[in-house]
Amino acid sequence: MKGKLIVALLGSFAASVAMADVSSVLTVDIQGPGGHSNGAYGNTNAVHAGVRAIMEIEKAIPSQKQCVVSGFSGGVSVNAIAADGHFKVSLNAKDEKEMAQLKQKVEAAVKKGVDAENAFRSVKPGQLTGGVPAEVRYTIK
């Protein structure tokens, strides 16, 4: 048997087993200005941007054998606009070339999701709110 055995538990009872020679786990961190829901209404929301990014990832890489998103977290309260959002993306590929393509798809999807949240809130790069950047930003490690 060549490669690694990757087991991804999806949902409560479903399981998917994939063969992969190359695997990688990316951490996506999304940051925004956050704020209290009353005084900062209309600010960009890092959790909303994260969900938009995940929807774009699922469109770009529909195979659960190649891509699994997990561990989403963010925000601090039900009545606060989330200043942060985080999730993991597990990728499985047959070789380094395919892995590079998958990583590019994740990068493009996250950018598209973040850009959509910024556009929805009509935020421009460099704009400030409460002395901090108004736009949602992201890093992928």
What is the predicted role of each segment?
Residues 2-19:
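Gram-negative bacterial Sec-dependent N-terminal signal peptides
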Residues 21-141:
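Metal-dependent amide/peptide-bond hydrolase catalytic core
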